Amino acid sequence: MARSIKKGPFVDGHLAKKVEAAVASRDRKPIKTWSRRSTILPDFIGLTIAVHNGRQHVPVLISENMVGHKLGEFALTRTFKGHAADKKAKR
């Protein structure tokens, strides 16, 4: 179910403050955050945000195509190692 338009996009307050400060100072240093649930706004374009994936912070460079998506979509939490090899194929 999509979020109501009248509510607007959700962004954690502490992340919004960090983004405003980075834009004002033109700081290129990655912004570290644990807020995977925050929506990417047009203000974030060009910034690098380090999103926590449960183990480490994954740097995500925000582009125009990402606006409207959540930060967590770009920091994968699971590592796929591949399916088990077929035993018949080894013979």
Swiss-Prot record:
GO MF term list: rRNA binding; structural constituent of ribosome
Please name the GO terms of the biological process aspect recorded for this protein, alphabetically. Answer: ribosomal small subunit assembly; translation
Instruction: Read off the Pfam families from this record.
Output: Ribosomal_S19
Query: Which keywords does this chain's UniProt record carry?
Result: Ribonucleoprotein, Ribosomal protein, RNA-binding, rRNA-binding
PROSITE patterns linked:
RIBOSOMAL_S19
The coiled-coil regions, if any, are: none
Stretches that traverse the bilayer:
none
A single GO CC term for this protein reads: cytoplasm
Question: Its domain of life?
Answer: Bacteria
**Per its database record, what is this protein's job?**
Protein S19 forms a complex with S13 that binds strongly to the 16S ribosomal RNA.
Q: Which HAMAP family match?
A: Ribosomal_uS19 (MF_00531)
* Sequence similarity: Belongs to the universal ribosomal protein uS19 family.
Entry's PANTHER family?
RIBOSOMAL PROTEIN S19P FAMILY MEMBER, SMALL RIBOSOMAL SUBUNIT PROTEIN US19M
Q: What name appears for this protein in its UniProt entry?
A: Small ribosomal subunit protein uS19
Organism field: Methylobacillus flagellatus (strain ATCC 51484 / DSM 6875 / VKM B-1610 / KT)
